[in-house]
């Protein structure tokens, strides 16, 4: 059997720190970010299905979200101000991401390509799946800002404002529900969110 470096590369997601140009109270890596995005994307899809007549496969969306930044094991996490400095850089970075996604898929054993390619290659996702994962990605970045700000780190003040605009652009009924039901707790302390717990 031929050796594959696929999972050895994926395991390096935990070594890639997000928000590299900003001072962080707590550093966040791509691996933990991907898990949070997967949980939030799954919730958004489930909310859409349960409350707003959606027909999404919430489990598939959780998987897509788990892999949404996987290509960063080859490209690193380019800071947002650099990535979107102008339209040409944004376009070139998208092309680099596409190459990295394909290179990552090519590392998987041939007999598993058809399993991993549709998870890693965003072109294989439906528009609705892409939208949900993008909403979850922006929501998780916003939640990171709330956590940093609540810890007294004003470095994330402008990032929060920018992300509020992004969330407004990606707004949906399921996102409004998530924001109303789940996000307020992120402004509270551990004691405050544990008050009603019988433990």
From Swiss-Prot:
Q: Which cofactors are required for activity?
A: a divalent metal cation
Residue ranges of domain HD in the record: 30-142
Task: Keywords in alphabetical order, please.
Answer: Cytoplasm, Hydrolase, Metal-binding, Nucleotide-binding
Q: Where is this site: Appears to be important in orienting the phosphate for catalysis?
A: 18
EC assignment: the record states 3.1.3.89
Which GO terms label this protein's molecular function in UniProt?
A: 5'-deoxynucleotidase activity; metal ion binding; nucleotide binding
- Binding of a divalent metal cation occurs at 33, 68-69, 137
* Catalytic reactions of this protein: a 2'-deoxyribonucleoside 5'-phosphate + H2O = a 2'-deoxyribonucleoside + phosphate
Which sites bind substrate?
Answer: 18-19, 33, 69, 77-80, 137
Q: Which Pfam families match?
A: YfbR-like
Q: Which NCBIfam families match?
A: PRK03826.1
What family is it from? Belongs to the 5DNU family.
- Function summary: Catalyzes the strictly specific dephosphorylation of 2'-deoxyribonucleoside 5'-monophosphates.
Q: What is this protein called?
A: 5'-deoxynucleotidase YfbR
Q: Which organism is it from?
A: Salmonella typhi
Q: Which gene produces this protein?
A: yfbR
């Amino acid at each position: 059997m031929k050796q594959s470096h696929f999972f050895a590369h994926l395991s390096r997601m935990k070594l890639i720190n997000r928000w590299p140009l900003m001072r962080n109270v707590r550093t966040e890596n791509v691996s933990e970010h991907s898990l949070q995005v997967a949980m939030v994307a799954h919730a958004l899809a489930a909310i859409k299905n349960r409350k707003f007549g959606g027909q999404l496969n919430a489990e598939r969306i959780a998987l897509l979200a788990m892999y949404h930044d996987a290509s960063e094991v080859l490209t690193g996490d380019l800071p947002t101000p650099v990535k979107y400095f102008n339209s040409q850089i944004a376009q070139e970075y998208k092309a680099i991401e596409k190459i990295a996604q394909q290179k990552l898929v090519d590392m998987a054993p041939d007999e598993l390509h058809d399993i991993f390619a549709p998870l890693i290659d965003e072109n294989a996702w439906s528009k609705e799946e892409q939208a949900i994962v993008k909403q979850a990605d922006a929501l998780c970045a916003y939640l990171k800002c709330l956590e940093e700000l609540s810890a007294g780190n004003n470095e994330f003040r402008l990032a929060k404002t920018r992300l509020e605009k992004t969330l407004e652009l990606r707004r949906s009924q399921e996102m409004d529900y998530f924001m109303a039901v789940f996000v307020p707790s992120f402004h509270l302390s551990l004691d405050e969110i544990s008050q009603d717990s019988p433990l």
